[in-house]
């Protein structure tokens, strides 16, 4: 071991290097009640251990685990600019649980990673409270996470987020799009806004248009519309899956309708989406007008008001719509599946 400091010299500490261990401990104490509210059957230990334990329910006969990981992207830059951190946690959860839901998986647990240059306990607690709220909406447990304070890695007041979700589905009930055939119906579930995608373009439009973000925008502030948290579709869609055969689903994230729907389609079919089947929400009308964004670019970047696509047989479409509406979802029949012509795109918006 090296020599101790000489008389009159103060030894360096981790705090001198920019890491506040006490702040980290205080944060753990703050977030434990939030995590506790998310606990569900299967969780075997509370937050704070080296590893999180989860026992898979015996209700599964041939369980397949489904995992997903994601972040919030540059929507965080707006959170920093507006000093509002209460919704990005739900965004983080939604991006992963909606992804694994597409294959029919029930989200079981979630872990988060919060990284910053200097830990602000109040900000971090607000973010993680939002993560816990998202987990409650999804019915999964916030079973663990990591808070990394890394001096000089991030500017003061900024942080980054990553999330990881694990779910389970019966092997025979995996939804993979393999049963989709021409004549099937494409349903669209309403988004709550831009969700967590396209925000580099959103921020560019704001930079160019320089709007008053506190101005009234259809009954709310413009910033509220822009920062609305990503909708979590888990509970209504798990209920639908138990009610009727769902052939395919697509979470409309980066790439919009035209790049996400093809991910669940076989090569021999195409989805034809009718753009007049739903009304483009005011936020997207504003973004398109202020940014002079072409229709094709809108459909390739934004969800344009459709956060989740569900594909069912034609004879099940009306029943599916009624079921989802009863669960509180706004849903439209937005298109159909057709046989794909040679050279045709797998999803076209007409």
From Swiss-Prot:
GO biological process: 'de novo' IMP biosynthetic process; adenine biosynthetic process
GO CC aspect terms: cytosol
Pathway: Purine metabolism; IMP biosynthesis via de novo pathway; 5-amino-1-(5-phospho-D-ribosyl)imidazole from N(2)-formyl-N(1)-(5-phospho-D-ribosyl)glycinamide: step 2/2
Keywords: ATP-binding, Cytoplasm, Ligase, Nucleotide-binding, Purine biosynthesis
Pfam families the UniProt entry points to: AIRS (PF00586), AIRS_C (PF02769)
Record-listed E.C. numbers: 6.3.3.1
GO molecular function terms attached to this record: ATP binding; phosphoribosylamine-glycine ligase activity; phosphoribosylformylglycinamidine cyclo-ligase activity
Catalytic reactions on record: 2-formamido-N(1)-(5-O-phospho-beta-D-ribosyl)acetamidine + ATP = 5-amino-1-(5-phospho-beta-D-ribosyl)imidazole + ADP + phosphate + H(+)
Protein name according to UniProt: Phosphoribosylformylglycinamidine cyclo-ligase
Family: Belongs to the AIR synthase family.
Subcellular location(s) per record: Cytoplasm
InterPro entries given in the database record: PurM-like_C_dom, PurM-like_C_sf, PurM-like_N, PurM-like_N_sf, PurM_cligase
Recorded name of the encoding gene: purM
PANTHER family, per the entry: TRIFUNCTIONAL PURINE BIOSYNTHETIC PROTEIN ADENOSINE-3, TRIFUNCTIONAL PURINE BIOSYNTHETIC PROTEIN ADENOSINE-3-RELATED
Enzyme class: ligase
């Amino acid at each position: 071991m090296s020599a101790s400091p000489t008389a009159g010299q103060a030894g360096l500490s981790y705090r001198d290097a920019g890491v506040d261990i006490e702040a980290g401990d205080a944060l753990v104490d703050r977030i434990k009640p939030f995590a506790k509210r998310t606990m569900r059957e299967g969780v075997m230990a509370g937050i704070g251990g080296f590893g999180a334990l989860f026992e898979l329910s015996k209700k599964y006969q041939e369980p397949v685990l489904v995992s997903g990981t994601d972040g919030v992207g540059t929507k965080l830059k707006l959170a920093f600019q507006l000093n509002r951190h209460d919704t990005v946690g739900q965004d983080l959860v939604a991006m992963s649980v909606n992804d694994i839901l597409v294959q029919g998986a029930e989200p079981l647990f979630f872990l988060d990673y919060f990284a910053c240059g200097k830990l602000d306990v109040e900000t971090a607690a607000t973010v993680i409270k939002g993560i816990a709220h998202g987990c409650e909406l999804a019915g999964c447990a916030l079973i663990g996470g990591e808070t990394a304070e890394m001096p000089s890695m991030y500017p003061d007041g900024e942080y980054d987020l990553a999330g990881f979700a694990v779910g389970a589905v019966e092997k025979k009930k995996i939804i993979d799009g393999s049963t989709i055939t021409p004549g099937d119906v494409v349903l669209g579930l309403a988004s709550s806004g831009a969700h967590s995608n396209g925000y580099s373009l959103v921020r560019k439009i704001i930079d160019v248009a320089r709007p008053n973000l506190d101005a009234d925008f259809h009954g709310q502030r413009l910033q509220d519309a822009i920062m609305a948290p990503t909708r979590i579709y888990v509970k209504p869609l798990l209920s639908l899956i138990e009610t009727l055969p769902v052939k395919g689903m697509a979470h409309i994230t980066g790439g919009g309708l035209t790049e996400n729907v093809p991910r669940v389609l076989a090569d021999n079919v195409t989805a034809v989406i009718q753009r007049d089947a739903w009304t483009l929400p005011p936020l997207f009308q504003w973004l398109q007008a202020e940014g002079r964004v072409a229709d094709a670019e809108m459909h390739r970047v934004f969800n344009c008001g459709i956060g989740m696509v569900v594909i069912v047989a034609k004879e099940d479409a009306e029943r599916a719509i009624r079921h989802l509406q009863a669960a509180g979802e706004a849903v439209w029949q937005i298109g159909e599946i057709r046989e794909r012509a040679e050279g045709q795109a797998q999803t076209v918006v007409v």
